[in-house]
Amino acid sequence: MSDSTHKIAVIGAGSWGTALAALLARHGHPTVLWGRDAAMVDTIDRTHENARYLPGIALPDSLRATTDLQAAVADAAWILVVVPSHAFTETIRLIAPLRPACPGVAWATKGFEPGSGRFLHEVARDILGPSVPLAVVTGPSFAKEVTLGLPTAITVHGDDATFAQAVADAMHGPTFRAYTGDDMVGAELGGAMKNVLAVATGVADGMQLGLNARAGLITRGLNEMLRLAAAIGARPETLMGLAGLGDLVLTCTGDLSRNRRLGLALGRGQSLNDAIRQIGQVVESVQMADEVMRQAEHHGIELPISNAVRAVLHGEITPEAGLKELLARERKPEYPQTLFT
């Protein structure tokens, strides 16, 4: 853990934003958590509990919460954005004119920009300019487990090695390991695709197709990640690490995953709207399936599992029909010879 105790601003008071803010505060960093909901923010600041997203879990007394964005980012050494992907662009635009002189900006948002399919680091770079260090925080991590202090490993990929290391150092601690890398494309691709593939495994489990089917979907889903990664210039080892395989396994098997729970509900015959209403939080896969397939079509890559998820989410096919189509596909070599070259 770093000895530095510079102020850190965390933007976004959902479950993951709150968990990371609590982690940083416990590691001795003056941490301010910003949120839009005045009542929720006031409760966090007074009672040190996020009763909406992390009920019953005590937050550090030193953690402050505010709805004043300018006050949150003032004098911050760096800023951590933790909002849903659909709010990412707007949030970066809001903080851009308020930043102190060139602090780094990191984010734990996963996915692409909805509607354009752009990588989030491309969005941030366009808005913030060329001189601001950027980093993405990703990996297999449920907010509840992090807040409870259970062992977790994540990775921080950035375009500035010093900044990525500073973010990792601030997060690293006795039960939280933070690695570093410089493949932002691969790290963001893994974070986007795992949400879509988690729906597929959830559907299979909801239909009671067995553990063999779950393992097959996870493995072939990883294959889809690797093939798209190769096409867009990401490094395969990134997808074989925490940002890819690690996050994929967790999201496909852990019932704390909203995307897996969505798949479970669909596999049991619930409608999409009813399933989302029951989950009660943002489910990234609904928009990400479109953006993943946008990337795949742009690069001429076939992603049968991801495409089946997209079709099910749009109501174009039933889960049963999607399964039948996947099982009827022409067999091919498991991996193209060029995948790892």
UniProtKB/Swiss-Prot annotation:
Active site (UniProt): K194 (proton acceptor)
Primary location recorded for the protein, binned into one broad class: cytoplasm
GO cellular component, one term: cytosol
Binding site residues for sn-glycerol 3-phosphate: K110, G139, S141, K194, D247, S257, R258, N259
GO terms for biological process, alphabetical: carbohydrate metabolic process; glycerol-3-phosphate biosynthetic process; glycerol-3-phosphate catabolic process; glycerophospholipid biosynthetic process
Pathway participation: Membrane lipid metabolism; glycerophospholipid metabolism
GO MF annotations, alphabetized: glycerol-3-phosphate dehydrogenase [NAD(P)+] activity; NAD binding
InterPro entries named in the record: 6-PGluconate_DH-like_C_sf, 6PGD_dom2, G3P_DH_NAD-dep, G3P_DH_NAD-dep_C, G3P_DH_NAD-dep_N, NAD(P)-bd_dom_sf
Gene3D superfamilies referenced in this protein's UniProt entry, alphabetically: N-(1-d-carboxylethyl)-l-norvaline Dehydrogenase, domain 2, NAD(P)-binding Rossmann-like Domain
Enzyme Commission number(s) from the entry: 1.1.1.94
A Pfam short name: NAD_Gly3P_dh_N
Nucleotide-binding keyword on record: yes
Its biological purpose: Catalyzes the reduction of the glycolytic intermediate dihydroxyacetone phosphate (DHAP) to sn-glycerol 3-phosphate (G3P), the key precursor for phospholipid synthesis.
Family to which this protein belongs: Belongs to the NAD-dependent glycerol-3-phosphate dehydrogenase family.
Protein name: Glycerol-3-phosphate dehydrogenase [NAD(P)+]
Species of the source: Xanthomonas oryzae pv. oryzae (strain KACC10331 / KXO85)
Phylogenetic placement of the source organism: Bacteria, Pseudomonadati, Pseudomonadota, Gammaproteobacteria, Lysobacterales
